[in-house]
Design a protein with these regions (language model features):
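Conserved active-site segments centered on acidic
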Residues: 179
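Active-site-proximal segments of metal-dependent phosphoesterases and phosphodiesterases across multiple
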Residues: 102-116, 126-176
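Metal-dependent phosphoesterase/phosphodiesterase active-site architecture
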Residues: 2-126, 183-283
Length: 283
């Protein structure tokens, strides 16, 4: 399919500016170019699935792998139609996983009132444990407050409101997220000397394709350290195009990401967004 620069810009602007959350413009775009498209053989393995299907798949013992069952999700999530949950990281650290996807459309996020209230309650109920919060979206990309079609009367809440809740609980150490495909570490201060770190990590799709290991350490001097170590793939830097093994394909994905036309070279972030020791006061 060949499109003009003007058509491509119009489509990209609609996506970026969230002016077409229902995809009407995209539908019209595809219709206008119907003659240059090709039919794809149907395959049930590519069939769209609902949130309920997604949860059921996680709860299916056939997909347990190394576990745990549900990988965080439970039958309670399936019954309530929710995709947020809490889990125990260690005896004195709880993990809280938020669902920041807005089903109302667009790629930016938010959370509903019920989830915000659940977050507040979960932090209060676990006030004697340190808390690490996880989500897909960053605080700055939670700007989409379109109503959830499944809960049309429920208000949506942005990143600033989530920060306000997290900052009001002294047991919150970090908010770990992604979405922006870039390594960024942001401090958040609150009254009473409270603070926490927002740790955003880049994507495996884009160069430099780094993962991050986060470790919590009690320094035994009234402080805690959060280490944010980035790790690199062990795949070769150069590709052997005849090698279709797991290692060979991993090498290919590294080479393709590095040579992607127009790819950003700033996604690794600055030095203070990568391998750091982030210190917090205990208490």
């Amino acid at each position: 399919m060949n499109v003009t620069a003007a058509e491509a810009k119009k489509l990209q602007d609609a996506i970026k500016n969230a002016t077409d959350p229902k995809g009407v413009g995209y539908r019209d775009f595809l219709k206008a170019h119907a003659r240059s498209t090709h039919s794809v053989t149907p395959d049930e393995k590519r069939a769209p699935y609902t949130c309920a299907d997604y949860l059921k798949a996680h709860l299916d013992p056939a997909h347990q792998g190394h576990g745990p069952v549900g990988h965080g999700y439970s039958s309670a999530n399936l019954d309530a139609g929710t995709q947020y949950y809490a889990f125990r990281i260690s005896d004195d650290v709880i993990g809280i996983s938020l669902d920041t996807t807005d089903a109302g459309g667009h790629y930016e996020g938010s959370i509903g009132t019920a989830q915000l209230a659940w977050l507040e309650k979960t932090l209060k109920d676990n006030k004697d444990s340190y808390a690490v919060v996880f989500s897909h979206h960053t605080s700055k990309t939670m700007t989409n407050t379109r109503p959830d079609p499944a809960r049309p009367g429920e208000r949506r809440h942005d990143g600033a409101e989530v920060i306000s809740v997290l900052a009001s609980h002294g047991n919150v150490l970090a908010w770990v997220n992604g979405h922006i495909h870039k390594n960024v570490i942001t401090p958040h201060k609150a009254s009473g000397g409270r603070s926490f770190w927002e740790i955003s990590t880049a994507s495996h799709v884009d160069y430099p394709q780094l993962a991050r290991v986060i470790e919590l350490v009690d320094n035994k001097d009234g402080t805690l350290s959060v280490f944010t170590t980035l790790i690199e793939s062990a795949a070769p830097h150069r590709t052997d195009f005849a090698d279709l093994s797991q290692t060979g394909l991993a090498a290919l994905y590294r080479e393709l990401s590095y040579n992607a036309p127009g790819a950003s070279k700033t996604l690794a972030g600055n030095a203070d967004d990568r391998n750091t020791e982030l210190v917090l006061k205990k208490g």
